[in-house]
Amino acid sequence: MEKQFKHLSIFTMITLVALGCQTPQEDLKVSENSRTYQEVWSEFFNERNMEIVNEQFFTDDVTVVIPDNNIVGIEGTKNYYGNFLLGFSDAEFTFIDIFGQGDKLVKHWNFKGTHDGDFFGIPPTGKSLNLSGTTLILMEDGKIKQEQNFFDNLDMLTQLGLME
């Protein structure tokens, strides 16, 4: 009985290690996806280049998952994220960390800026925003297919002086 348990334990450990390891091809895919993703969003936010949201880097049916109604398509995605550039003329976007497996990436980010323009219909408050969050990303054939952002909305609204 003890011998069987020992063999089962060894088999279980080997299986878990094997399942948790990525192949060199998977590592390369994650690396390429991460590089592309970081280049696109750094160019968008820090160089203020909205035109980089295009069919070269995004699937036609790219989806931004949001609570009320998902944003679908390249133009919708460009307009959605464009609100951050319109609302914060000094927007500064930083990647804190990015990692992944296969076509899935996770991004930890920070966004800073002064609310000096229209932001999703909110008139300028002149307040500074320093917001961190996490994004789940799905890539397809080296293109961005889906994003879902997680951040503290109450903290954002409080920093903008809209909530107490």
Task: Identify the meaning behind each predicted range.
Residues M1-S9:
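Bacterial N-terminal signal peptides that target proteins for export
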Residues S9-A18:
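Bacterial N-terminal signal peptides
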Residues R35, M50-L105:
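A solvent-exposed, acidic/Ser-Thr-rich amphipathic alpha-helical stretch
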Residues I98-V106, L138-K145:
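A short, structured loop/turn motif at beta-sheet edges
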Residues D103-H115:
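A short hydrophobic beta-strand element
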Residues G113-D141:
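Exposed beta-sheet edge and beta->alpha loop/turn motif
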Residues K145-E164:
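Low-complexity, intrinsically disordered terminal/linker segments enriched in charged
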